[in-house]
């Protein structure tokens, strides 16, 4: 079945015809009906709802609960609804209450009483849990792809800046010079943890609750493993009460999403700072910046500012779902309807932010190399290397540290940098200072000697780049 002469029902004039309405003596108040409905947002689950229902009816036939002919008719009817939805012809209103009733009602319109057998051996409680897990599994894979794209953009940019120096900061005070590529690859590592975290979470998402019923299982001889295999689930819930009420997987996803946004927001903050006149480390290219309505000279970093701001949305969704879950008795409660908008918007937000930040890194940032080079040579961020120099001459490090503190204090009082001191002045502080002190404290040498594993030394950074490229190539 690919089409039907039966027109889809899109009106909202049947609010008293709920599936459950025979239990009640009067119709639901229209305001309460609208308040109760979730169709306006859980329509996002329709493809997964249809897929889950198709697996369910084939299981019913496989288990001898309905005939194969009935299962095939239902399956074809569900596929017809899928095509109607994709063509914009199936647009249920609030009279449907939720996507599950909307699909079931439309199925009965299309194929008649056989459609009433769809829900045999199933509750909306295990049905929605199945839909949500199928949706989230799919979205996790998409987010992981976007993370890889973000990492790829970072690697490409870092490849151009292994030899570019930039001040490294602690407490937002200049600390030690580093390779710009090393700085960019720090975000690659954060993103890799994000990717791995999602993989771990997906193991717990990919567990089937289908067939658990409302809360206690079902008396029908169903085969839960059959539907799990059909839908690609790796495991089954072992307790019906837990399975229909569990939203740990959703909370875990929002935790992971929040960490993704933390990392994107941190990078955004740095881009905003670096693009300011006060730093002047980067210029934003026209394709990734906007202007002011009143100040014609402005070029605003809207992309990183929006990402920084949108992080709060995702954090809020995590908090809201934690609060929803904290007081719920077993098993299902209507409060759980509140999980979907948090998840849907969380997914939409992180996907949009990853896409935007990938474009920003790939084409929107122009590092001002001369400014960066001058920035690492106009301060005392090489002071640690003076202490290291003395330590290598046999001076205990703490003693060397105190000597260098006195050197810096003297330089500040005389408005000098370390490189401006004469050898005679150096030797007034300690006789071990020699001519090679000048090369030892040059910014490029300061970076080059930090060649321990994971350090900013140029050799280490190049090795890290190659490892990152290998990781990305292996994950394709």
Curated annotation (Swiss-Prot):
Family label: Belongs to the lyase 1 family. Argininosuccinate lyase subfamily.
Protein name, as recorded: Argininosuccinate lyase
Catalysed reaction, written as an equation: 2-(N(omega)-L-arginino)succinate = fumarate + L-arginine
Biological pathway: Amino-acid biosynthesis; L-arginine biosynthesis; L-arginine from L-ornithine and carbamoyl phosphate: step 3/3
Enzyme Commission code: 4.3.2.1
A Pfam family recorded for this sequence: ASL_C2
Alphabetized Gene3D superfamilies for the sequence: Fumarase/aspartase (C-terminal domain), Fumarase/aspartase (Central domain), Fumarase/aspartase (N-terminal domain)
Domain of life from the UniProt record: Bacteria
Biological classification of the source: Bacteria, Bacillati, Cyanobacteriota, Cyanophyceae, Acaryochloridales
Keyword set, alphabetical order: Amino-acid biosynthesis, Arginine biosynthesis, Cytoplasm, Lyase
UniProt entry tagged with the keyword Ligase: no
A single Gene Ontology CC term: cytosol
Entries under NCBIfam families matching the protein: argH
Organism from which the protein derives: Acaryochloris marina (strain MBIC 11017)
Location relative to the cell: Cytoplasm
Top-level EC class as recorded in UniProt: lyase
Residues making up the signal peptide according to the UniProt record: none
GO biological process: arginine biosynthetic process via ornithine; L-arginine biosynthetic process
HAMAP family xrefs: Arg_succ_lyase
Any GO MF annotation of the entry: argininosuccinate lyase activity
